[in-house]
């Protein structure tokens, strides 16, 4: 998809701060430092729109990125990061759970996992939780440029097996560094939303 307009339109910690224009939303979930901000920047062709950080746990709000006035990417706080207080983690958890389980505009979750590693227990819990709530999932294996191309399929198979992935859930590889997988990711997203470019 050709992105002509992209902006951070809303920052929310509670439902009354969510956008009111009823555009379809795709949430991005993943462990801290899996590359959600880099994914957003590469997909939207906007360097620095989503702030990347070497410090895990940087995103602490629901960040709504409006794209071409047609849809939103919603960056949610990364999970699995221990260096925040239990109180903060509980607050994030409640905020994320409320959004994911109750938001009517949410059409799917892009769950990002690192292609170099088997999904963590947190990844598995998140995937199973979304399946429990009937939320469609598009799995994106990030950092594909970090391993040889010959190992991609083996790693994708391991990811699918570890998560006990449902056959209907797409599993894509992606590299924010090279743009690898970007077109396929957009095709999958638009197909899921049943909209054309």
UniProtKB/Swiss-Prot annotation:
GO CC field: cytosol
Gene3D superfamilies: P-loop containing nucleotide triphosphate hydrolases
Reported cofactor(s): Mg(2+)
Binding site for GTP: 30-37, 57-61, 75-78, 142-145, 174-176
SUPFAM superfamilies: P-loop containing nucleoside triphosphate hydrolases (SSF52540)
One BP term from GO: division septum assembly
GO molecular function: GTP binding; metal ion binding
HAMAP family reported in the protein's UniProt record: GTPase_EngB (MF_00321)
Family in the record: Belongs to the TRAFAC class TrmE-Era-EngA-EngB-Septin-like GTPase superfamily. EngB GTPase family.
Annotated protein name in UniProt: Probable GTP-binding protein EngB
Gene designation per UniProt: engB
